[in-house]
Amino acid sequence: MSRVVLAMSGGVDSSVAAHLLLRDGHEVIGVFMRHGEASAAACRIDSDEPQNTNPLNLPVLGDSAGGKRADHKQGCCSATDAADARRVAMSMGIPFYSLDLQEDFRKIVDYFVDDYLAARTPNPCVKCNHWIKFGRLFDYADGVDAEFVATGHYARMVHSNGRSELHRGLDGHKDQSYALFGIDPARLSRMMLPVGDFTKPEIREMATSLGLGVSDKKDSQEICFVTQGHHSDFVKSRRPEMVGATAGEIVTTGGKVVGEHKGFEAFTIGQRKRLGVAMGEPHFVIRIEPDTRRVVIGRAEELLRPGLVADQCNWFVTREELADAQSVGIQIRYNGQPHPGHVVMDGSDPTRMKVMFDDPQAAVAPGQAAVVYDGERVLGGGWITHAIDHIADGSPPPA
């Protein structure tokens, strides 16, 4: 029997994951990671945690509400979520602890804000998985001598012949493997993803049959900490000194000024809605120029790019294994599909790669992840620095 630290969010996926781990005979420790930005007191829950189960000396939240469920509306790990997670853990008889990771999560928020202010499109979920869910949680697991860390992600771990591979989840509509590419390769052998072998309807049905009380709970939103308004409003609230500093012109690809905008952080490559100009036919954001503060718009065909360059690459395979992959596809957005193409690691720096698609792809957005698949298997990926505008324009920029 293995000891497993399970990230419990209070949602249906991690709740059923707890059941599946227990069913398979594991010793489960449930951990709720408190990293939202409402007051810590709003999310305090019962914990009789002995001192030796908190080796990192992270703040452990006690109970200030008499154990009653409170409905604190917060997009990320709310008090309601904490209460739901605790209730599920108690019903299954597993120990449950809440760790205050607000300080760690602030760097996720800062990254999100800084990327938009640099005219990139961030993906905070990927960073959170890397830094917190499969970062800090592993630190905690090491401290309690847990062999594995588990979550409710819709992806699959394939452990065989001494190898550990990350694969797509069985439910193609819910697959989250894209958001896991940044995990330390050395940790794959200690990861467990119990719900990845099921579809979402199957997980909800299982939760109902188990009487968990969270079977009809809504899925979490894409940007968990932006709970109201547009993301640009959140960016301005975090960097009020930048209000007005990113305003500029909206121009066509031909250079014609057609309008003005209040801040380029409100835009992303491929965006069609909320452009603030009427062109008579559909126009999209083609590129954002932070130096001139211009937002360049054009027709759909002007979005197409033959390739991209990425850095900060993380690989689960060797250079030779990448070269030998038979059906490589590159996914460039969370809800997208892999596109066939050719991937080349930088000759001197494996943390950089060039991708050339078999067919040009639309909306290659700097700041987003480019994740490389061989069929169902995740080979690795990196962060898009820029799109390649022409076939000949393929060399990675100088370091």
UniProtKB/Swiss-Prot annotation:
It is found in: Cytoplasm. GO terms for cellular component: cytoplasm. It comes from the Bacteria. Disulfide bonds join C128-C224. Belongs to the MnmA/TRMU family. Catalyzes the 2-thiolation of uridine at the wobble position (U34) of tRNA, leading to the formation of s(2)U34. This is tRNA-specific 2-thiouridylase MnmA. The gene is mnmA.
